[in-house]
């Protein structure tokens, strides 16, 4: 799924040069390096930030191994949400041409929640910050903050892809709903598409995930793909993982790029249709429900109805017989005053 995000973000027909690529929760850099490969290592500069020291060190090593040493100085260890590092000379946050992200979905960020509430970058968290729950602070949906940070950090003609728990694409209220509404109802509709993936597709989560694709230059019609039934289950480091076959990856890529409509797999609804469906980004909600009609003669219809009635009568009769049997059994049950006395006398 790492290369598939890159393939869907970068069209091979595009001549992409001198661009910036960013991952605000980069880990060891798998996603952003796959993106750099799709663009061409010498045609892009990579910028990352991650809270883990160890991951950031691995990220640097990955850049060296992938002939991208020119980006080493842009690998930053730090808290992206509280202290975003990459800025312009005037102190404003830097904007990027391409962004990819597979952020943590849930994390306790109660200790810097108030910092995000009073964020100095106006409008960065436009849809709000998840509340601190009284219990289970580890369940705080931090990915919603990363999603908003990603949108804020994207150039006006930039493209992005972010991994979200599949619940995000259908949530009927709250921050998730506000973000989806913004992608559809903003000055421009910027939702490029959504691919709902099979479960266990990413190593770090067993949650069902979807990938949301954004194109800030504006979109006429998005493509929604339900790829949740694809893939084969494999064992990796003792854990079950789903792996997409080569032909399945190609199927998703071709469908997405060409905006094809495939029965029970992909749809291209208008943004008005998406509004009518409560801003749902789930392909399944737009699939046609098919009813198969069979041509039969009147005699055949009557014969089937007679058989149906006969079967139903037999079942009714059997049901009555069982009712009578149960009532008879209940009549045989009488009160026994000795029950319980033996135990009480011990």
Residue ranges and their predicted role:
Residues 93-346:
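A conserved structural/catalytic subdomain of Rossmann-like adenosyl-cofactor enzymes
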Residues 1-101, 106-110, 115, 164-167, ...:
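Conserved S-adenosyl-L-methionine
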């Amino acid at each position: 799924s790492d290369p598939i995000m890159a393939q869907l973000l970068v069209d091979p027909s595009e001549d992409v040069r001198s661009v910036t690529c960013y991952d605000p929760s980069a880990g060891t850099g798998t996603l952003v390096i796959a993106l750099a490969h799709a663009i061409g290592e010498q045609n892009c500069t990579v910028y990352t930030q991650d809270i883990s020291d160890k991951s950031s060190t691995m990220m640097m090593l990955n850049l060296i191994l992938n002939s991208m040493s020119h980006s080493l100085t842009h690998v930053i260890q730090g808290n992206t949400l509280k202290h975003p590092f990459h800025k312009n000379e005037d102190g404003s946050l830097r904007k990027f041409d391409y962004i990819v992200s597979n952020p943590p979905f849930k994390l306790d960020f109660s200790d810097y929640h108030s910092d995000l509430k009073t964020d100095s970058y106006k409008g960065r968290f436009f849809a709000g910050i998840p509340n601190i729950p009284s219990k289970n602070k580890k369940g705080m949906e931090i990915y919603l903050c990363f999603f908003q940070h990603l949108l804020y950090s994207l150039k006006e003609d930039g493209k992005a892809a972010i991994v979200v728990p599949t619940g995000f694409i259908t949530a009927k209220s709250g921050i998730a709903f506000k973000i989806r509404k913004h992608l559809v109802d903003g000055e421009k509709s910027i939702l490029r598409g959504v691919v709902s993936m099979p479960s266990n597709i990413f190593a770090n989560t067993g949650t069902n995930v979807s990938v949301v694709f954004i194109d800030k230059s504006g979109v006429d019609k998005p493509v929604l793909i339900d790829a949740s039934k694809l893939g084969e289950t494999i064992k990796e480091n003792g854990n079950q993982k789903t792996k997409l076959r080569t032909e399945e990856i190609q199927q998703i890529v071709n469908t997405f790029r060409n905006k094809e409509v495939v029965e029970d797999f992909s749809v291209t609804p208008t943004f008005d249709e998406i509004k009518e469906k409560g801003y749902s980004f789930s392909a399944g909600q737009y699939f046609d429900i098919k009813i198969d009609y069979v041509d039969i003669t009147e005699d055949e219809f009557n014969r089937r109805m007679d058989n149906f009635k006969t079967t139903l009568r037999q079942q009714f009769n059997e049901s009555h017989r069982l009712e009578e049997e149960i009532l008879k059994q209940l009549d045989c049950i009488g009160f026994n005053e000795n029950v319980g006395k033996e135990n009480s006398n011990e």
